[in-house]
């Protein structure tokens, strides 16, 4: 690990540098020197955000005509990745509606945070994730509702992850005691089997894709998903939460205790600093729009985006309308007759 300014910790730095050098070595000397850099910060290796970023980086490099080298940089969590971009360590940040909301309000991990570069603005929203909790099958009879996890040791995903933040706010809304135990993702199955944690947050993308560490856990461990109870769902809806239905057959390869589960969704995206050029960001968004069906074939998590690309951008902006929209996205939405004059356009580019 390499310590970074502002407390950020960059994982796999040597791998990232090696990847850049390898790409540069394939280019003619003049071209390698002329290519500009776009640093794409994500969550740590093994997370869904990191895994799919590599595929999107290839699409983006092609769309930009070889003018840029896109480097995927893994960080401890999306929160750290966001801060890294706003302290000059990247241009594109992996984030979600909940993280953008906390940043806008300067709450949670963003309390007292002071960016040293122009701030993140709405740019591109890519897929929803659905937060649930799973337990080892041998312990399933002990847990019927989420209230049964109150005050119990649970791995709520990596601290600072958007699903971790989502679980934290859910517990707060329901009045439950949030007792997080931090473990390595690779230890997820063992921790559940041994009882180090009694539950672990499990999440799907678009009700389909599991993160890499949960795919591994699915092979190694028999587990059950603990559904929200009706009174919990009612309380969350009354507080303004959306509830998504996840069909087990679309997300899991084995019996996990039911055919459908109710989950609390969050919307993930890749937002950039306000000072990135309008033309660059417009080309980026248009490339993902044009390649949306191709992205869906690469990973089913992109299915909702492919079906309603424009609507997903509108949803992302409306989640935190106090945050400005990048001029590149504003141009794209105006072309598609989807711009809302109540939104504000960032003036930093």
For each predicted feature, which ranges?
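Ligand-binding clefts/hinges and TM-proximal coupling segments of bilobed small-molecule sensing domains
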Residues: 144, 150-169, 240-310
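An extracytoplasmic/periplasmic, membrane-proximal ligand-sensing/linker region
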Residues: 204-227, 235-238, 279-349
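Pocket-lining segment of extracytoplasmic ligand-binding domains
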Residues: 97-99, 106-115, 135-139, 177-277
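N-terminal segment of the mature folded domain
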Residues: 86-125
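Bacterial N-terminal signal peptides that target proteins for export
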Residues: 1-16
């Amino acid at each position: 690990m390499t310590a970074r300014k502002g407390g950020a910790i960059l994982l796999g730095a040597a791998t990232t540098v090696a990847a850049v050098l390898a790409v540069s070595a394939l280019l003619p000397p003049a071209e390698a020197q002329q290519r500009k850099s776009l640093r794409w910060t994500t969550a740590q290796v093994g997370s869904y955000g990191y895994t799919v970023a590599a595929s999107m980086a290839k699409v983006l490099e092609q769309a930009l005509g070889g003018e840029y080298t896109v480097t995927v940089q893994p960080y401890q969590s999306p929160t750290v990745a966001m801060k890294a971009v706003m302290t000059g360590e990247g241009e594109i940040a992996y984030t979600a509606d909940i993280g953008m909301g906390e940043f806008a309000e300067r709450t949670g991990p963003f309390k007292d945070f002071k960016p040293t570069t122009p701030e993140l603005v709405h740019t591109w929203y890519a897929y929803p994730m659905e937060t649930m909790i799973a337990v080892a099958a041998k312990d399933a009879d002990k847990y019927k509702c989420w209230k049964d996890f109150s005050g119990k040791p649970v791995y709520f995903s990596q601290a600072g992850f958007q699903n971790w933040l989502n679980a934290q706010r859910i517990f707060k809304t329901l009045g439950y005691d949030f007792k997080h135990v931090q473990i390595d993702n690779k230890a997820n199955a063992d921790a559940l089997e041994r009882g180090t944690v009694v539950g672990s947050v499990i999440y799907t993308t678009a009700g389909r894709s599991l993160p890499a560490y949960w795919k591994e856990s699915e092979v190694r461990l028999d587990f059950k998903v603990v559904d929200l109870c009706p009174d919990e769902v009612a309380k969350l809806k009354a507080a303004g939460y959306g509830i998504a239905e996840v069909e087990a057959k679309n997300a899991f390869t084995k019996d996990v205790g039911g055919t459908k589960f109710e989950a609390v969704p969050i919307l993930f995206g890749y937002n950039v600093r306000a000072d990135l050029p309008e033309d660059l960001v417009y080309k980026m968004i248009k490339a993902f729009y044009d390649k949306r069906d191709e992205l869906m074939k690469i990973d089913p998590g992109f299915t909702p985006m492919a079906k309603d690309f424009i609507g997903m951008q509108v949803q992302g902006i409306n989640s935190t309308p106090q945050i400005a929209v990048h001029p590149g996205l504003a141009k794209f939405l105006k072309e598609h007759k989807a711009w809302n004059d109540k939104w504000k356009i960032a003036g930093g580019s």
